[in-house]
Design a protein with these regions (language model features):
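A cross-family phosphate/adenosyl-ligand binding-site feature
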Residues: 50, 61-124, 128-129
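Short, glycine-rich nucleotide/cofactor-binding loops
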Residues: 52-59, 146
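Internal, conserved structured core segments that host functional sites
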Residues: 120, 128-173
Length: 313
């Protein structure tokens, strides 16, 4: 959006809006941003509240670094899996009980999936509605089709499904190299979004939540190139399954590694991170193939006609 409005420290440019932090400490006045008729910039007296989770487990360096970085900006609570739950997507545990324990550092951990953690937190554990759900920092990239499988994205998506803005942060390469740099970049992004405060009124039935997927190259902070808005790329098919013999003589099967990048053209998350940029992709949950609804409507009509002719009911 090109619309811009300045006044008393407020600049509105759609999602690129920024708010003078002094206004956040002012009395609870609110100013409407004309860039969007349903969005308000809310100026809070109270600190923002952030719920953190991940899929690598509550002891992973990524979530520890992220928590330390974000709690300089807001009140943060961590509810994360007890153990590594990578590639659990948005799975919920429905047929066994879940238990919540608290670690010495105050982190709460659950014997469940990333989505379990966020779901439990939002439906009773916290006792309040956070302003933002943040997941990560993941040990490895979540680009292209990774987002379908990712527990990191799944945790953020659970917050989004509850109408809360959410972000999934991942580091492109495994091993936690430059994790402090990634946490600092994540803090910078969250701070900018906090400045925007792009949320719908609490009483509105159409809460303006959003879901962002962010991938950060493993580089020193001053070497990272600017944030780049991207579409998801695409990988080749996964590598072949790995077959081994167990000590008991049974065949064991290990899921093969993710395929290499296939669609890594300019404009994709793969291309951006390969060039040293931090990639950011807005996601949605609607899996409907809108482009082909017309085709399938015609196909369904022909199928129905065939059924009628054949007399199959």
């Amino acid at each position: 959006m090109s619309h811009e409005r300045r006044g008393r420290g407020v600049v509105c440019r759609g999602l690129a809006a920024s708010v003078d932090l002094r206004l956040l400490r002012s009395a609870g006045r609110e100013r409407r941003c004309d860039a969007h008729p349903t969005i308000r910039l809310i100026q809070h007296q109270q600190p923002m509240k952030i719920l953190l989770s991940n899929d690598d487990g509550f002891q992973a360096p990524g979530i520890v670094a992220l928590y330390e970085a974000l709690t300089t900006l807001a009140d943060g609570k961590c509810v994360a899996p007890e153990h590594n739950n990578s590639a659990k997507s948005s799975a919920l545990t429905l047929h066994s009980p879940l238990y919540v324990h608290q670690a010495a550092n105050g982190f709460r951990y659950v014997n469940g999936t990333p989505a379990d953690c966020v779901h439990i937190a939002l439906t009773g554990l916290l006792g309040y509605r956070p302003d933002l759900v943040v997941s990560g920092i993941n040990n490895g990239a979540n680009m292209g089709g990774d987002t379908i499988y990712s527990g990191t994205v799944g945790a953020a998506m659970e917050g989004y499904l509850f109408g809360i803005p959410a972000i999934a942060f991942s580091q492109v390469d495994k091993g936690w190299g430059e994790i402090e740099s990634a946490a600092a970049k994540a803090r910078e992004i969250v701070q900018q979004l906090m400045g925007n405060r792009l949320v719908s009124p609490a009483e509105s039935s159409d809460a303006a939540s959003w879901l962002l997927n962010v991938n950060i190259p493993n580089m020193p902070l001053d070497a990272l190139k600017p944030l780049k808005l991207c579409r998801l790329g695409r990988r080749h098919a996964a590598e072949r399954v790995i077959v081994q013999d167990s000590p008991r003589g049974e065949k064991m099967y290990w899921i093969g590694g993710a395929g290499a990048a296939k669609d890594d053209a300019d404009g994709t998350d793969f291309h951006a991170t390969a060039q040293g940029h931090v990639s950011m992709t807005p996601l949605k949950v609607d899996l409907t193939d809108h482009d082909n609804l017309g085709y399938w409507a015609q196909t369904a009509a022909r199928m129905q006609a065939f059924v009628a002719v054949e007399g199959v009911r």
